[in-house]
Amino acid sequence: MTADTSLRPADHPAVKSGKVGVLLVNLGTPDGTDYTSMRRYLREFLTDRRVIEWSPWKWYPILFGVVLNTRPRKVGKAYELIWNKEKNESYLRTYTRNQSELMAEHLKDLATVKVDWAMRYGTPSIASRIEALKQEGCDRIVLFPLYPQYAAATTATVNDKAFQKLLSMRWQPALRTVPDYHDDETYIEALATSVEKHLATLDWKPEMLLASFHGIPMSYFKQGDPYYCQCQKTGRLLRERLGLTKENFMVTFQSRFGPEEWLQPYTDKTVEKLAQDGVKRIAVINPGFVSDCLETLEEIAEQAAHSFHENGGEKFAHIPCLNDGEDGMTVLEKVVRRELQGWI
């Protein structure tokens, strides 16, 4: 409902209201693959206390003394391998922008809804897009962290950043945070359909399907983070929908960082062992990633595939994320329409 401005006094400040914003938020991306861009991005990411929960007195000497001097070049080279050279940006940025534009198209029947997108780290920032939506007249905003499974290091830090922006605003928009959807029927069906469609293009059948999720330190799980349990449930529902058994389907965890123990089994170690044990054909899907990014395109499609072949494997397939495809957008639209109820 658009506000009635007819009764305002002539000297009333110009304001817009009556709109509802939808803000899609993903992890983030560097602006380029060069050292400076990578260091700036990694600094913001690795100083987030939700991501690295160590005391700054312990972590910062390591971060600023070692990590930020060595890791930008290494990670920059990895990004170069999967960089969208046509648009000169990461594919995560490309897909997230596309998802926002497609969502706006899908919701065009809702005249008061405005759709935008942001990144937790890097640009466009959450704060800048909340401000932009407010300037467009959005006095209510649905904040959608694009993570099917909840984790403090992903979903919670998006929410933190949004509420941090609200602290600085005189006229705060009402904010509705979107919960996880790890066991949503439409989501599971979209994953299963993606697996079936991709495997149908192969001239071989995998002996094992791995569902590889981003890992978190084991200590986070022990402190009450529900992420591990939600990943396991997503995996179980996907396995049951595909009609697979525990003998040919596994949930694994990737992307560990630092000396701590992380959720297991580790994807890289599992891929090596499967090949060494005589498994010749495997496929990997990343159900926890809404869009393909460094962790899927380089870590799985490149590194894991290479490791599998180096250790005796013969056939390796990486199943793309749902990205901005029709099935993936159906999932996101269902969640958004559900969360808009009562506001439109």
UniProtKB/Swiss-Prot annotation:
Enzymatic reactions: heme b + 2 H(+) = protoporphyrin IX + Fe(2+)
Enzyme Commission number: 4.98.1.1
Keyword Glycoprotein among record annotations: no
Pathway membership: Porphyrin-containing compound metabolism; protoheme biosynthesis; protoheme from protoporphyrin-IX: step 1/1
One Gene Ontology MF term: metal ion binding
Protein origin, superkingdom: Bacteria
Xref: Gene3D superfamilies: 3.40.50.1400
Compartmental location: Cytoplasm
Keywords, ordered alphabetically: Cytoplasm, Heme biosynthesis, Iron, Lyase, Metal-binding, Porphyrin biosynthesis
Chief subcellular location: cytoplasm
GO biological process: heme biosynthetic process
PROSITE patterns in UniProt: FERROCHELATASE (PS00534)
InterPro entries: Ferrochelatase, Ferrochelatase_AS, Ferrochelatase_C, Ferrochelatase_N
Residues where Fe cation binds: 214, 295
An example Gene Ontology CC term for this record: cytoplasm
HAMAP family referenced in this protein's UniProt entry, alphabetically: Ferrochelatase
Purpose of the protein: Catalyzes the ferrous insertion into protoporphyrin IX.
Family named by the database record: Belongs to the ferrochelatase family.
Name of the protein in its database record: Ferrochelatase
Native species: Rhizobium leguminosarum bv. trifolii (strain WSM2304)
